[in-house]
Amino acid sequence: GGFTGRGLAVSTVAEANKMSDDQPVVLVGQIERSLGDEKYQFKDATGTIVVEIDDEDWNGVNATPQNTIEIHGEVDKDMFNTKIDADRVILKK
């Protein structure tokens, strides 16, 4: 069991770049490449952003740049950069 119903609306990379630190976010797009150290370059139609996905948060998902994925996480902002700290990765069919 668990919750079924409306959750967070999907945001774009452009919107995520303007959000506040620690704001929950859902993004749908592709991972273009690994940047090392559990960081990845993620893109959608509006741009690219760095996503940090801990190994255990992949939940067995294997993705290539051709796969569309949904990432649930929080905005992680510091003085110079915005990235997404992922909690969950879902492979879209």
Predicted regions located by residue number:
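OB-fold and OB-like single-stranded nucleic-acid-recognition modules
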Residues: 1-93
